[in-house]
Amino acid sequence: MRRSFAFKITLLTLAWLLLAIACQQVPAKVFWPVVFGALTTPVALGCTALLALYWLRRNWRVALLPVVALALTWPQVQRGLALHAPINEKVSTKNQELGGGKTLRSTFFAPPPNTVSLLSANVRIFNVYAQLRDPDFASSIGFIRWLAESPADVLCLQEYYDEPGGSKEDGSVFRSERALGRANGRHSFVSTTLTNAIGAEFGMAIFSRFVIVRRGVIPFGKLSQNHAMWADLVRPAARTGRGRPDTIRVFNLHLQSMAMADADIAKATESRAGLRQKAPNLLRRFRNGAVARGAQVDTVLACIARSPYPVLLAGDLNDPPYSYTYDQLADELQNAWATVGLGPGFTYNGRLPGLRIDQQFAGPQWQVRGCRVHREINWSDHFPVEAVYRLR
């Protein structure tokens, strides 16, 4: 009787796993509750693994069911828990003095010349708002300097902020385009979505050590902080390893957020009264965000399909690996962390821990040589992601 019950549980779990994976392929605009089904995928995978262990101790023939299921869905496992041996890629260590006797130690890739290193980060407008900034601008200065001194060939930044002429209040602290671009030998492409009264610019940016020969912006309806941009970069012959220059296309994107305030989330989880008060609004924002991101990723993929050059993509998806957004990108491109990473690779530094919503993807022409999350950088609610690529 016990075995019969366990066998039924096994079949139900396998059906759950298949349904959860199927939910990832349905856009929220068709039936938005599928988002919740997709989010249960890692739980279904974990239960399948436990059942495999259970049956291996009792009946190896039955154990074949969950074992084969795990083998067939192994790419799904790697999405949330990458299991790869460390790649022997050269690294370099940089120390940044922070003041007060503190030193920030960061390890970057030091790849050979025939590769491309890309660092992406949601920089949270470099903490310019009063509720984010320090009295001495320590986090703003530190973050801009860290990015400027990173050895990455390409920087893809979301929630970017720049004061081109400085300001009376802030001086030259937020002259970020100058610091990240010309001052460090990088070409710049800033996609500005808003210019305020003092001439400060909000938007997204791509900085490149390679010449930018073409560029474009992909709005999702009205141009806002949530949009995509692309740039064609020409690598000189000395950097290609092929004796001739080549061109690559880099996409930088920031998809629709949930727009859920931390205070609302905290209140909803504190008591039943708070849940009743905040849940409807949070649920509505969750639904609207999922629907918007589904349409946005379809727009970006259509642009990627028209690219005549090998593609690299980086950005803040605002969606976890078990979602329609990620699934559509993973169908066409290889995810850097899932390909070579080790562990869950969490990138979100906010009130909801355990999320990997900042991603890098590469087209099939690329070999992913390494990927790391810079968790030592806590000046934003997102940790920077760095990866190295080489054309096959």
Model features per residue range: what roles?
Residues 3-57, 63-64, 217, 232, ...:
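Metal-dependent phosphoester-hydrolase catalytic domains
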Residues 35, 120-140, 162-168, 259-289:
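Acidic/histidine-rich helix-loop elements
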Residues 117-119, 156, 313:
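Residue-level marker for buried hydrophobic side chains located in beta-strands
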Residues 45-88:
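Transmembrane alpha-helices and immediately adjacent membrane-cytoplasm interface residues
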Residues 239, 244-247, 251, 272, ...:
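His/acidic metal-ligating clusters that form di-metal
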